[in-house]
């Protein structure tokens, strides 16, 4: 009997040892993602800064590196897989895909097209038709501003030959308006006109949205990268849109995130907040109101493709369809 009890105790002890909890597995390594933003770090990228600083990317299992490049360079790098995901507008995506660069646009960030033509309040320019024979500063006959300018002029039955273009390849064209050397200039609705309006009378601003629905900046991915890192990319988009919603509700939160990322912005909080508030307006439209932030406007894409394909010296090298340009795989609805 004593032997039996001893055996039972030994078995119980063995059973307890066998039921011990295994040591926890180490957490998975975060997925490294290189995210391309516009050329100059600014308050306009506040949602990316907030998502990074608040830990939304980290909590989603991501190790995010934010880099700044010009739009055409980002398109190429994303197509090559050197950058995982980046901001680019539709007028860059269409020519790239038509030339065989394997990218897709998967989430809208700017629901409105940001490129505009603006003129000082005292310029005597009140309508697009008033631009005839006027000096307009712009970087060159290429890119999103050039396509936008052709759409605006065409709406008043004007062509680029009906105005005097003053080209600034170094992107200093805003200064020509400040110096009175140009009557108007191309720019961004959430930048130069905002700054001018803070310093004096609000400028005249011509937008293209009611003329041709050119597609604003959104997130593009390479096809191979999407296949290899789809889950991580979806997590990044979800975290970014979460931060976007928070900034819409509380712009000061976005401003603080931008200043933490770019301390020089603190030198003029009033201007930076005004720029951010103008930017927030451009993140939203009827499509995002109906379908949520990031939603893709397929009819708008088709209208843009049709317009760009019909331009003189069209940048569209070969016919493309909307399905070749877009992916629904980045938006986890």
Specify the residue positions occupied by each region the protein language model found.
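Pocket-lining segment of extracytoplasmic ligand-binding domains
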Residues: 91-92, 172-267
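Bacterial lipoprotein signal-peptidase II cleavage site
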Residues: 16-26
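Secondary-structure end/capping motifs
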Residues: 229-311
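Short, glycine-/small- and polar/acidic-enriched structural segments
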Residues: 24-169, 174-179, 183-190, 205-207, ...
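Soluble non-cytosolic domains of exported or imported proteins
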Residues: 42, 69, 87, 143-144, ...
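Sec-dependent N-terminal signal peptides
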Residues: 1-9
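Conserved C-terminal helix/tail region of periplasmic/extracytoplasmic solute-binding proteins
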Residues: 301-333
């Amino acid at each position: 009997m004593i032997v039996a009890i001893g055996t039972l105790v030994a078995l119980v002890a063995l059973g307890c040892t066998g039921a011990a909890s295994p040591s926890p597995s180490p957490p998975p390594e975060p997925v490294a993602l290189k995210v391309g933003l516009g050329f100059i770090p600014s308050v306009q990228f506040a949602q990316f800064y907030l998502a990074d600083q608040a830990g939304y990317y980290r909590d989603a299992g991501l190790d995010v590196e934010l880099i700044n490049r010009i739009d055409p360079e980002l398109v190429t790098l994303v197509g090559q897989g050197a950058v995982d995901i980046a901001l680019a507008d539709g007028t860059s995506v269409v020519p790239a895909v038509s030339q065989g660069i394997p990218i897709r646009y998967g989430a809208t960030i700017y629901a409105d097209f940001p490129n505009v033509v603006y003129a000082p309040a005292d310029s005597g320019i009140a309508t697009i038709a008033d631009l005839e024979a006027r000096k307009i500063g712009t970087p060159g006959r290429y890119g999103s501003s050039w396509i936008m300018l052709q759409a605006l002029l065409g709406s008043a039955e004007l062509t680029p030959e009906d105005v005097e273009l003053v080209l600034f390849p170094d992107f200093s064209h805003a200064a020509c308006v400040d110096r009175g050397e140009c009557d108007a200039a191309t720019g961004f609705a959430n930048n130069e006109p905002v700054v001018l309006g803070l310093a004096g009378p609000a400028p005249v601003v011509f937008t293209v949205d009611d003329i041709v629905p050119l597609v604003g900046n959104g997130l593009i991915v390479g096809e191979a990268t999407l296949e290899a890192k789809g889950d991580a990319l979806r997590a990044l988009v979800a975290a970014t849109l979460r931060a976007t919603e928070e900034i819409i509700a509380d712009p000061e939160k976005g401003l603080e995130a931008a200043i933490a990322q770019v301390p020089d912005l603190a030198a003029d909080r009033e201007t930076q907040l005004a720029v951010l508030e103008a930017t927030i307006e451009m993140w939203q439209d009827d499509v995002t109101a109906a379908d949520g932030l990031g939603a893709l406007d397929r009819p708008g894409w088709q209208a843009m493709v049709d317009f760009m394909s019909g331009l003189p010296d069209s940048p569209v090298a070969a016919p493309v369809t909307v399905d070749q340009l877009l992916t629904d795989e980045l938006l986890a609805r």
